[in-house]
Amino acid sequence: MTRATNFTELYAGKGILDTYMVAEKITRYYTQDLIQLSGLSESSLTPLVILDLACGTGVVSDALHDMLNFQPKGNWELTCGDISTELTGHVKQKILERGWENSIAKVVDAQNTELPTGHYTHVFAALAFTSFPDTYAAMKEVMRILQPGGTLTISTWQRTEWLAVVEAAVAIIPADLPFPTTKEFMSCMNPGWDSEDYVHSRFEEAGFHSVQVTTISKQFETSVEDLYKIAQPVIPIIVSKWWNQEQRDKYENDILPALQRHLNETYGENGLVPQEWTAVFATGQKGS
Protein backbone atom coordinates (compact mmCIF):
# COMPACT_ATOMS: atom_id res chain seq x y z
CA MET A 1 0.00 0.00 0.00
CA THR A 2 1.30 3.43 -1.01
CA ARG A 3 1.79 5.78 1.96
CA ALA A 4 -0.49 8.61 0.89
CA THR A 5 -0.59 11.98 2.61
CA ASN A 6 -3.76 13.10 0.79
CA PHE A 7 -6.72 11.42 -0.87
CA THR A 8 -5.50 12.09 -4.41
CA GLU A 9 -2.33 10.12 -3.69
CA LEU A 10 -4.35 7.39 -1.96
CA TYR A 11 -6.66 6.76 -4.90
CA ALA A 12 -3.82 6.84 -7.42
CA GLY A 13 -1.45 4.68 -5.39
CA LYS A 14 -0.77 0.97 -5.35
CA GLY A 15 -2.84 -1.22 -3.05
CA ILE A 16 -6.06 0.80 -3.35
CA LEU A 17 -7.91 -2.30 -4.56
CA ASP A 18 -7.26 -4.10 -1.27
CA THR A 19 -8.73 -1.18 0.66
CA TYR A 20 -11.76 -0.97 -1.62
CA MET A 21 -12.44 -4.71 -1.39
CA VAL A 22 -12.88 -4.23 2.35
CA ALA A 23 -14.78 -0.95 2.06
CA GLU A 24 -17.27 -2.36 -0.46
CA LYS A 25 -18.67 -4.60 2.28
CA ILE A 26 -19.99 -1.35 3.79
CA THR A 27 -20.65 0.79 0.71
CA ARG A 28 -22.97 -1.91 -0.66
CA TYR A 29 -25.48 -0.99 2.04
CA TYR A 30 -25.98 2.40 0.36
CA THR A 31 -26.29 1.47 -3.32
CA GLN A 32 -30.01 0.69 -3.45
CA ASP A 33 -30.86 4.07 -1.93
CA LEU A 34 -28.72 5.76 -4.57
CA ILE A 35 -30.39 3.98 -7.47
CA GLN A 36 -33.88 4.41 -6.05
CA LEU A 37 -33.40 8.17 -5.64
CA SER A 38 -32.33 8.45 -9.29
CA GLY A 39 -35.75 7.33 -10.53
CA LEU A 40 -34.04 4.96 -12.95
CA SER A 41 -36.84 2.39 -12.88
CA GLU A 42 -39.40 5.04 -13.93
CA SER A 43 -37.22 6.73 -16.55
CA SER A 44 -38.85 7.49 -19.90
CA LEU A 45 -35.48 7.82 -21.62
CA THR A 46 -34.58 4.89 -23.84
CA PRO A 47 -32.25 3.19 -24.26
CA LEU A 48 -30.75 3.72 -20.81
CA VAL A 49 -27.13 4.83 -21.16
CA ILE A 50 -25.55 4.75 -17.71
CA LEU A 51 -22.20 5.90 -16.34
CA ASP A 52 -20.92 4.61 -12.99
CA LEU A 53 -18.44 7.42 -12.33
CA ALA A 54 -15.62 6.76 -9.85
CA CYS A 55 -16.89 3.19 -9.91
CA GLY A 56 -14.38 1.73 -7.45
CA THR A 57 -14.84 -2.03 -7.34
CA GLY A 58 -18.19 -1.75 -9.12
CA VAL A 59 -20.71 -2.05 -6.29
CA VAL A 60 -23.16 0.30 -8.03
CA SER A 61 -22.66 -1.58 -11.28
CA ASP A 62 -23.42 -4.83 -9.45
CA ALA A 63 -26.70 -3.40 -8.20
CA LEU A 64 -27.59 -2.01 -11.63
CA HIS A 65 -27.11 -5.41 -13.23
CA ASP A 66 -29.22 -7.04 -10.54
CA MET A 67 -31.98 -4.49 -11.12
CA LEU A 68 -31.91 -4.40 -14.92
CA ASN A 69 -31.03 -8.02 -15.59
CA PHE A 70 -34.55 -8.71 -16.90
CA GLN A 71 -34.20 -5.98 -19.53
CA PRO A 72 -33.10 -6.91 -23.06
CA LYS A 73 -29.42 -6.05 -23.33
CA GLY A 74 -30.14 -3.63 -26.17
CA ASN A 75 -32.30 -1.53 -23.87
CA TRP A 76 -29.44 -0.41 -21.65
CA GLU A 77 -25.68 -0.06 -21.55
CA LEU A 78 -23.20 0.72 -18.80
CA THR A 79 -19.81 2.41 -18.65
CA CYS A 80 -17.77 1.94 -15.47
CA GLY A 81 -15.13 4.64 -15.08
CA ASP A 82 -12.48 5.31 -12.45
CA ILE A 83 -9.23 7.28 -12.22
CA SER A 84 -7.46 4.21 -10.77
CA THR A 85 -6.03 1.72 -13.25
CA GLU A 86 -5.99 -0.87 -10.46
CA LEU A 87 -9.71 -0.50 -9.77
CA THR A 88 -10.59 -0.29 -13.46
CA GLY A 89 -8.68 -3.50 -14.12
CA HIS A 90 -10.66 -5.22 -11.37
CA VAL A 91 -13.97 -4.14 -12.90
CA LYS A 92 -12.84 -5.21 -16.38
CA GLN A 93 -12.18 -8.68 -15.00
CA LYS A 94 -15.58 -8.69 -13.31
CA ILE A 95 -17.25 -7.80 -16.61
CA LEU A 96 -15.53 -10.72 -18.33
CA GLU A 97 -16.27 -13.22 -15.56
CA ARG A 98 -19.94 -12.27 -15.31
CA GLY A 99 -20.58 -11.94 -19.01
CA TRP A 100 -21.78 -8.35 -18.88
CA GLU A 101 -21.85 -7.91 -22.65
CA ASN A 102 -23.46 -4.47 -22.46
CA SER A 103 -20.81 -3.06 -20.08
CA ILE A 104 -17.32 -1.64 -20.41
CA ALA A 105 -14.75 -0.35 -17.91
CA LYS A 106 -12.20 2.34 -18.64
CA VAL A 107 -9.93 4.81 -16.89
CA VAL A 108 -11.87 8.06 -16.53
CA ASP A 109 -10.91 11.36 -14.91
CA ALA A 110 -14.15 12.83 -13.53
CA GLN A 111 -12.91 16.36 -14.24
CA ASN A 112 -12.09 15.62 -17.89
CA THR A 113 -13.79 12.38 -18.85
CA GLU A 114 -13.15 12.54 -22.61
CA LEU A 115 -16.58 10.89 -22.95
CA PRO A 116 -19.05 11.99 -25.65
CA THR A 117 -21.22 15.06 -25.15
CA GLY A 118 -24.94 14.53 -24.50
CA HIS A 119 -24.57 10.77 -24.33
CA TYR A 120 -25.69 9.46 -20.92
CA THR A 121 -29.19 9.23 -19.50
CA HIS A 122 -27.94 8.61 -15.96
CA VAL A 123 -24.67 9.30 -14.17
CA PHE A 124 -24.03 7.85 -10.72
CA ALA A 125 -21.17 9.00 -8.48
CA ALA A 126 -21.28 7.06 -5.22
CA LEU A 127 -19.30 8.45 -2.28
CA ALA A 128 -16.91 10.16 -4.67
CA PHE A 129 -17.26 13.94 -4.91
CA THR A 130 -15.19 14.65 -1.81
CA SER A 131 -12.26 12.89 -3.51
CA PHE A 132 -12.29 14.95 -6.73
CA PRO A 133 -9.58 17.65 -6.73
CA ASP A 134 -11.90 20.04 -8.60
CA THR A 135 -15.58 19.39 -7.90
CA TYR A 136 -16.67 22.35 -10.03
CA ALA A 137 -14.96 20.85 -13.07
CA ALA A 138 -16.51 17.46 -12.29
CA MET A 139 -20.02 18.93 -12.06
CA LYS A 140 -19.53 20.83 -15.31
CA GLU A 141 -18.26 17.69 -17.02
CA VAL A 142 -21.24 15.61 -15.88
CA MET A 143 -23.60 18.26 -17.20
CA ARG A 144 -21.80 18.13 -20.55
CA ILE A 145 -21.99 14.35 -20.99
CA LEU A 146 -25.63 13.99 -19.89
CA GLN A 147 -28.42 13.87 -22.43
CA PRO A 148 -31.11 16.55 -22.16
CA GLY A 149 -33.37 15.32 -19.38
CA GLY A 150 -30.59 13.13 -18.00
CA THR A 151 -30.00 12.62 -14.29
CA LEU A 152 -27.01 12.90 -11.96
CA THR A 153 -27.30 11.05 -8.65
CA ILE A 154 -24.58 11.12 -6.01
CA SER A 155 -23.83 10.21 -2.42
CA THR A 156 -21.22 11.64 -0.06
CA TRP A 157 -20.26 10.69 3.47
CA GLN A 158 -21.53 12.83 6.32
CA ARG A 159 -20.42 10.68 9.25
CA THR A 160 -18.38 7.48 9.57
CA GLU A 161 -17.80 6.04 13.03
CA TRP A 162 -14.47 4.33 12.29
CA LEU A 163 -12.82 7.70 12.97
CA ALA A 164 -13.95 7.63 16.61
CA VAL A 165 -12.35 4.20 17.00
CA VAL A 166 -9.02 5.54 15.74
CA GLU A 167 -9.32 8.56 18.04
CA ALA A 168 -9.79 6.23 21.02
CA ALA A 169 -6.68 4.32 19.95
CA VAL A 170 -4.60 7.50 19.61
CA ALA A 171 -5.68 8.46 23.14
CA ILE A 172 -3.81 5.38 24.40
CA ILE A 173 -0.50 6.87 23.25
CA PRO A 174 1.09 8.76 26.19
CA ALA A 175 1.19 12.17 24.53
CA ASP A 176 -1.16 15.08 23.96
CA LEU A 177 -1.86 14.46 20.28
CA PRO A 178 -4.41 16.42 18.23
CA PHE A 179 -7.15 14.58 16.38
CA PRO A 180 -9.75 15.90 13.92
CA THR A 181 -13.46 15.97 14.57
CA THR A 182 -15.63 14.14 12.07
CA LYS A 183 -16.58 17.50 10.53
CA GLU A 184 -12.94 18.54 10.19
CA PHE A 185 -11.96 15.22 8.64
CA MET A 186 -14.85 15.21 6.18
CA SER A 187 -13.88 18.74 5.14
CA CYS A 188 -10.15 18.17 4.78
CA MET A 189 -10.28 17.98 0.97
CA ASN A 190 -13.62 19.35 -0.26
CA PRO A 191 -15.61 21.02 2.53
CA GLY A 192 -19.38 21.21 2.40
CA TRP A 193 -20.31 17.90 0.83
CA ASP A 194 -21.48 16.56 4.20
CA SER A 195 -24.23 19.23 4.24
CA GLU A 196 -27.62 18.80 2.55
CA ASP A 197 -27.92 22.56 1.97
CA TYR A 198 -24.47 22.81 0.40
CA VAL A 199 -25.01 19.84 -1.90
CA HIS A 200 -28.40 21.22 -2.97
CA SER A 201 -26.85 24.59 -3.78
CA ARG A 202 -24.03 22.99 -5.81
CA PHE A 203 -26.52 21.06 -7.94
CA GLU A 204 -28.55 24.19 -8.64
CA GLU A 205 -25.43 26.26 -9.28
CA ALA A 206 -24.34 23.69 -11.90
CA GLY A 207 -27.69 24.06 -13.68
CA PHE A 208 -29.59 21.01 -12.46
CA HIS A 209 -33.30 21.26 -11.71
CA SER A 210 -35.78 19.08 -9.78
CA VAL A 211 -33.03 18.66 -7.20
CA GLN A 212 -33.72 16.32 -4.29
CA VAL A 213 -31.40 15.86 -1.31
CA THR A 214 -31.75 13.55 1.67
CA THR A 215 -29.64 11.99 4.41
CA ILE A 216 -29.67 8.26 5.19
CA SER A 217 -28.02 6.38 8.07
CA LYS A 218 -27.27 2.67 8.20
CA GLN A 219 -26.38 0.56 11.21
CA PHE A 220 -24.20 -2.50 10.74
CA GLU A 221 -21.32 -4.44 12.24
CA THR A 222 -17.85 -4.79 10.78
CA SER A 223 -15.10 -7.12 11.86
CA VAL A 224 -12.13 -5.93 13.89
CA GLU A 225 -9.89 -6.98 11.00
CA ASP A 226 -11.85 -5.00 8.42
CA LEU A 227 -12.04 -1.84 10.51
CA TYR A 228 -8.28 -1.97 10.97
CA LYS A 229 -7.83 -2.29 7.20
CA ILE A 230 -10.18 0.62 6.53
CA ALA A 231 -8.32 2.91 8.94
CA GLN A 232 -4.76 1.90 8.08
CA PRO A 233 -4.28 3.77 4.76
CA VAL A 234 -5.97 6.93 6.05
CA ILE A 235 -3.82 7.38 9.15
CA PRO A 236 -0.91 9.00 7.22
CA ILE A 237 -3.39 11.55 5.84
CA ILE A 238 -4.57 12.40 9.35
CA VAL A 239 -1.09 12.81 10.83
CA SER A 240 0.17 14.75 7.80
CA LYS A 241 -2.59 17.32 8.19
CA TRP A 242 -3.07 17.57 11.95
CA TRP A 243 0.30 16.67 13.51
CA ASN A 244 3.53 18.62 13.38
CA GLN A 245 6.78 17.05 12.22
CA GLU A 246 7.98 16.29 15.75
CA GLN A 247 4.73 14.50 16.58
CA ARG A 248 4.89 12.50 13.36
CA ASP A 249 8.49 11.47 13.96
CA LYS A 250 7.85 10.39 17.54
CA TYR A 251 4.40 8.84 17.44
CA GLU A 252 3.12 7.93 13.96
CA ASN A 253 4.51 4.40 14.17
CA ASP A 254 2.67 3.91 17.48
CA ILE A 255 -0.81 4.38 16.01
CA LEU A 256 -1.38 1.03 14.31
CA PRO A 257 -0.22 -1.03 17.33
CA ALA A 258 -2.44 1.14 19.54
CA LEU A 259 -5.36 0.64 17.16
CA GLN A 260 -4.91 -3.12 17.14
CA ARG A 261 -4.69 -3.18 20.93
CA HIS A 262 -7.79 -1.01 21.34
CA LEU A 263 -9.82 -3.13 18.92
CA ASN A 264 -8.79 -6.41 20.52
CA GLU A 265 -9.36 -5.21 24.09
CA THR A 266 -12.69 -3.53 23.33
CA TYR A 267 -14.30 -5.93 20.87
CA GLY A 268 -12.23 -9.12 21.06
CA GLU A 269 -9.66 -10.38 18.58
CA ASN A 270 -12.37 -11.87 16.34
CA GLY A 271 -15.11 -9.49 17.43
CA LEU A 272 -17.52 -7.23 15.60
CA VAL A 273 -17.54 -3.45 15.84
CA PRO A 274 -20.98 -1.77 15.82
CA GLN A 275 -21.09 1.16 13.42
CA GLU A 276 -23.54 3.76 12.15
CA TRP A 277 -22.53 5.67 9.05
CA THR A 278 -24.50 8.49 7.44
CA ALA A 279 -24.46 9.65 3.83
CA VAL A 280 -25.98 12.57 1.95
CA PHE A 281 -27.80 11.58 -1.26
CA ALA A 282 -28.71 13.98 -4.05
CA THR A 283 -30.19 13.84 -7.52
CA GLY A 284 -30.95 16.41 -10.19
CA GLN A 285 -31.92 16.61 -13.85
CA LYS A 286 -30.38 18.38 -16.81
CA GLY A 287 -32.83 20.59 -18.62
CA SER A 288 -34.41 19.30 -21.79
Curated annotation (Swiss-Prot):
Phenotype on disruption: Leads to the accumulation of glandicoline B. Does not affect the production of roquefortine C but decreases the production of meleagrin.
Pathway: Alkaloid biosynthesis
GO process terms (BP): methylation
Signal peptide: none
Coiled-coil spans in chain: none
Enzyme Commission number: 3.1.1.-
Catalytic activity: glandicoline B + S-adenosyl-L-methionine = meleagrin + S-adenosyl-L-homocysteine + H(+)
Ion transport as UniProt keyword: no
Family: Belongs to the class I-like SAM-binding methyltransferase superfamily.
Protein name: Glandicoline B O-methyltransferase roqN
Gene responsible for this protein: roqN
